[in-house]
Amino acid sequence: MTEPFTPPHRLSAWSTLENHAARLRTMRIAELFEHDAARFATLSFGHRGLLLDLSKQSIDAPALAALVDLAGQARLPDGIEALFAGEHLNFTEDRAVLHMALRGACAAPLEDAATLAQSQQRMRAFTVALRSGTMTGATGKPIRLVVNLGIGGSDLGPRMAAQALVPTGLRATPEVRFVANIDRRELDEALADADPASTLFVVSSKSFATAETLANAQAARAWLQAGLGAGCDPALHFTAVSNATDAAAAFGIPAERVFPLPEWVGGRYSVWSTIGLPLMIAIGASEFDAFLAGARAMDEHFRTAPPGENLPVLMGLAGLWNTDFLGIESLALLPYAHGLRSFAAWLQQLEMESNGKRCLRDGSGSVIHTSPIVWGGVGTVGQHAFHQLFYQGTRRVALDFIVPVAAADDVSQRSLVENAFAQSAALMSGRDLDTALASLRAKGLAESEAAVLAPHLVCPGNQPSTTVLLPALDAFSLGQLMALYEHKVFVQGWIWGINSFDQYGVELGKEMARSLSAGSGENHDASTAGLMAAAEAMRRTPDRS
């Protein structure tokens, strides 16, 4: 994109939105329902079974129209088309951003098309061999356990999706486990009941140079060598997803067991690529196809639907509204499904690594806020932990409820759905002092006692929330959901004017870690140098006196 860039706060729609925000800050969300009986119908949107409800946001139709106008002034439709056309929107690294091509929603670059098709075929053949029991290790035993060694995008997406799609209590063959932390305890736990002769490790590192992943791979190799004994080749117990075939070969993984991935696939968008190999192994090739199909359906909707009917666009605009016009600094993800227990961790990387930036496309610094702080946890567990802050804390928090509906006869899921709806309603409506007093009087408390206790029962409410309803937590719906959030993040990054596809802050942290690993205390601040010295002293002589 070569057109001049205008920061969003300088667009005319921005001042219009500031006026809407001043008006809506004085109104409660519950009042908006009183003024508009058709509010749910107006502010809920569907596509291929997925429902996006924005009616509990602190927004109304005129404000939403102004947000859509902002998207137009920011040339978002041009940005969407540039994304799908393969323009180098990751301009700092001079790369296209084409993870949608992995799902069949757009064409891969011609020079990569053949390699991509071959890799996908190899993934399928590898998966079939593992799941059928025909792939064996060095001793001839079939592989029964696959352990993925990766971190960041090489772990979060496949791990989250496997948790969501492998039914609880079903012991898949082979079983797939994930190890990311350099803390040896995670690897030890993954291997506690494992048989080296029937265990396969997938080393997932695009560069085959990720420090944490290589450390775990080396520990895994030592474990295999100790367990298999002399004369057994541990290479039969490794495969890699990487572009560094020479580095993988130096480690002991032959080229025929290395699955490459295109350079235009960023880590946090890589579950759709060969990085998704452990997911395909866990759920099977046909379910992986359904996963891709769900994402492709959302891709096609994002590319073709008008902004005012486009789910990722509307979701992104609602989030931008909360961040920049209502001053809400955090987004809590509340999936009401145990299978989505790692969804918040996946979204943390997607949102905060993509949009946690301040440098704009023209090199200037942003004067408005970008990514919110993303956190959360699974319902109903969170209701007994951090939901208290939503009800009676001093901050407004934006909330995303993700609710798979499932079958009508699933009693536990029906209860989860009811709890999710109750939470979103209660957090919107709250409880005022008069209601609190009335409830205490009804319980028989004396007026003096009720007057003392009632203020402690007041819940301000007015917490804005989005609800995403899924027909079920299946492969197609999960693909839709993940692509919805991916494109939402693009929408926000585009309007803010940042590059959502690099992560130079992460690289600075890696550089510092390498410096400390080299053992040099020079050129470090006094605190860091002091901590290094204290840690070394503790290693030598722990003082517990």
From Swiss-Prot:
Domain of life according to the entry: Bacteria
GO CC, one annotated term: cytosol
Family stated for the protein in its record: Belongs to the GPI family.
Bilayer-spanning residue ranges: none
Catalytic site: E353, H384, K510
Protein's UniProt name: Glucose-6-phosphate isomerase
Reactions catalysed: alpha-D-glucose 6-phosphate = beta-D-fructose 6-phosphate
Entry function: Catalyzes the reversible isomerization of glucose-6-phosphate to fructose-6-phosphate.
Gene Ontology biological process terms in this record: gluconeogenesis; glucose 6-phosphate metabolic process; glycolytic process
GO molecular function, one term: monosaccharide binding
Signal peptide: none
InterPro entries on file: G6P_Isomerase, G6P_Isomerase_C, Phosphoglucose_isomerase_CS, SIS_dom_sf, SIS_PGI_1, SIS_PGI_2
Keywords assigned by UniProt, alphabetized: Cytoplasm, Gluconeogenesis, Glycolysis, Isomerase
Major localization listed first in the record, in broad terms: cytoplasm
Compartments where located: Cytoplasm
Pathway noted in the entry: Carbohydrate biosynthesis; gluconeogenesis; Carbohydrate degradation; glycolysis; D-glyceraldehyde 3-phosphate and glycerone phosphate from D-glucose: step 2/4
Disulfide bridge positions per record: none
Enzyme class per UniProt: isomerase
Enzyme nomenclature, EC number: 5.3.1.9
